[in-house]
C-alpha cells in the first residue's frame, strides 16, 4: 500500500491536458477525485503505478510522473513528513525518511548512501512486475528534490540526478526541473549531492 497524497496532483494535471479525470480514475478502482483530498487515504502500490502509466499514455506526456512529483513536498508523507520538518539537521531528517518511509510505501525503499564526498538519496522499487515504475521513480525523485530544497534552502542543487529508466526522447523537462547533469539507465534512481550538506541545520 502507498499513501495517495503524493499523487494528489493527478486530477488537476489531467484537466490541464484536457482530460476528464473521473472516468479514468474509476477505471483504476478510484471512486472519484474527492479521494485525493483525504490525506490519509491509501491504495495498492501496483494501482498507483498503473494509474501513472495510463495518465502518461492518455496525455501523451512521457514525463507525467515528474510533473506530479513537482507539485508534492514533505507534507504528502504525513507523519513521516512531520518528522522531517522537526529534524535539527539534514542527515537526521534523511535518516528519518529512510527509516520510516515503509510506513506509507510498501512497494519501494528509500536509501541514503555516502561515498567519499558524495551523498546519494535514492528510491528503489522492489515489487516486481508493476506497471509504470518509471513514472513512480520520476515522481519520487521530484518529491526528493523538493524535500532537499526545503531542508537545505534554495541554494541546494544536486551535482547529478540518476534515473533508472531509458534516455527519453525529450530530456528538457528533466533538465529544467532538476537543474543538474542527468544520467539515465542508472543502476538506481538517486539524487547525488555533496555530503557536506548532511550536517547542516535544516532551513525549516
PLM regions and their residue ranges:
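N-terminal low-complexity or simple alpha-helical regulatory segments
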Residues: 1-121, 143, 168
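Alpha-helical bundle regulatory/interaction domains
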Residues: 90-204
Amino acid at each position: 500500500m502507498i499513501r495517495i497524497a503524493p499523487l494528489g496532483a493527478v486530477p488537476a494535471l489531467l484537466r490541464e491536458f484536457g482530460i476528464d479525470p473521473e472516468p479514468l480514475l474509476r477505471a483504476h478502482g478510484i471512486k472519484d477525485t474527492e479521494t485525493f483530498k483525504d490525506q490519509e487515504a491509501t491504495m495498492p502500490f501496483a494501482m498507483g503505478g498503473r494509474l501513472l502509466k495510463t495518465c502518461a499514455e492518455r496525455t501523451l506526456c512521457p514525463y507525467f510522473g515528474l510533473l506530479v512529483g513537482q507539485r508534492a513536498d514533505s507534507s504528502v508523507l504525513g507523519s513521516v513528513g512531520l518528522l522531517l520538518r522537526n529534524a535539527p539537521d539534514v542527515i537526521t531528517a534523511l535518516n528519518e525518511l529512510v527509516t520510516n518511509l515503509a510506513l506509507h510505501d510498501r512497494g519501494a525503499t528509500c536509501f541514503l548512501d555516502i561515498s567519499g564526498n558524495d551523498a546519494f538519496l535514492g528510491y528503489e522499487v522492489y515489487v516486481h512486475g508493476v506497471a509504470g515504475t518509471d513514472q513512480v521513480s520520476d515522481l519520487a525523485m521530484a518529491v526528493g528534490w523538493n524535500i532537499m530544497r526545503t531542508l537545505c534552502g534554495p541554494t541546494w542543487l544536486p551535482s547529478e540526478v540518476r534515473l533508472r529508466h531509458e534516455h527519453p526522447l525529450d530530456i528538457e523537462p528533466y533538465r529544467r526541473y532538476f537543474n543538474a547533469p542527468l544520467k539515465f539507465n542508472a543502476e538506481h534512481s538517486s539524487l547525488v549531492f555533496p555530503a557536506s550538506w548532511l550536517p547542516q541545520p535544516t532551513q525549516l
